[in-house]
Amino acid sequence: MVKVLAVLYDGGEHAKQVPGLLGTTENELGLRKWLEDQGHTLVTTSDKDREGSTFDRELEDAEIIITTPFHPGYLTAERLARAKKLKLAVTAGIGSDHVDLDAANKTNGGITVAEVTGSNVVSVAEHVVMTILVLVRNFVPAHEQIEAGRWDVAEVAKDEYDLEGKVVGTVGVGRIGERVLRRLKGFDCKELLYYDYQPLSPEKEKEIGCRRVENLEEMLAQCDVVTINCPLHESTRGLFNKDLISKMKRGSWLVNTARGAIVVKEDVAEALRTGHLRGYGGDVWFPQPAPADHVLRTAKNPFGGGNAMVPHMSGTSLDAQKRYAEGVKRILDSYLSGRFDYRPEDLIVHQGKYATRAYGQREDVKIPGQ
């Protein structure tokens, strides 16, 4: 019998109304009956942050843990050291930066860390394009004006622009970044740029109509819109700080659906306040859930707009939840059956080694100036 611990977010009445909210503590990724029919135990909780949390208590004798980027149970080196039986850590979604991967490689002979690669890349890419449009078209202040019973076209049109003719750049052109560029192609942007250590093929660049810029600061200086689509690792943590933001065009927009810790939140808020950034939007925060006084909840530009922040939802649409729930079950089945036939693309660390280059495990994956 195997004990499985799942750290998920609470759905409350919403999970009852919509059973498709699979990523909640109530609906448990649809796993309970399947696991219990095999004689295994499933413990589900959202309690993860306080001292002596259910997460901490139940982790000590769990063999498998399931976490999610949308309500991350941070698997620190200290927590892993107490998890004497842990063999498999599964991310329900994509992005395993909430796990100390170096420590996972050294714990219990090497804990396998896996995620459901590709499960929500379309979902996030769509959210990026939506956020770009929401910011550029100044949608949020306009909608708030209508809700307040007011009507002042000039007030909102003074900070509204077209996406056509703008230069858009992505930091990272992996599965999400590439899909963002493809979706932007139809907006007749002046130019689509990308910064990544790994270039796209010439054929893809021609098909999408994009161009690689090898220096990050050089790309930022050209862009009206910048979207962050790279993983969080030590070279990208705090990357968008006061210094790097100062290299961006004054009045540009920044979108972040990657990870909250890639930006320095106070520096983003100050750039908004001064108008150096016209807008900032996305759905990722650090920590998560975001505290009520998190500066990016209320940061605004000089016109009182420019904020398109939402809870961490871009990758957890109902369609995405179905895909990553199925993926988690597939990974669990590979382990519980003893086949260990994981999809190679799902593996982050395995058998004490890194199985991917996505988390900065290369000498050439270094951000200039870092």
UniProtKB/Swiss-Prot annotation:
SUPFAM superfamilies: Formate/glycerate dehydrogenase catalytic domain-like, NAD(P)-binding Rossmann-fold domains. It is found in: Cytoplasm. The keyword Transmembrane helix does not apply. Thermostable up to 55 degrees Celsius. One of its GO terms (biological process) is formate catabolic process. Its main location: cytoplasm. Optimum pH is 5. It comes from the Eukaryota. Its EC number is 1.17.1.9. GO terms for cellular component: cytosol. Pfam families: 2-Hacid_dh, 2-Hacid_dh_C. Keywords: Cytoplasm, NAD, Oxidoreductase. NAD(+) binds at R175, I176, D196, P231, L232, H233, E234, S235, T257, D283, H312, M313, S314, G315. The record marks R259, H312 as: Important for catalytic activity. Substrate binds at I94, N120. It catalyses: formate + NAD(+) = CO2 + NADH. Homodimer. PANTHER family: FORMATE DEHYDROGENASE 1. Belongs to the D-isomer specific 2-hydroxyacid dehydrogenase family. FDH subfamily. NCBIfam families: PRK07574.1. Catalyzes the NAD(+)-dependent oxidation of formate to carbon dioxide. Formate oxidation is the final step in the methanol oxidation pathway in methylotrophic microorganisms. Has a role in the detoxification of exogenous formate in non-methylotrophic organisms. This is Formate dehydrogenase. The lineage of its organism: Eukaryota, Fungi, Dikarya, Ascomycota, Pezizomycotina. The gene is FDH.
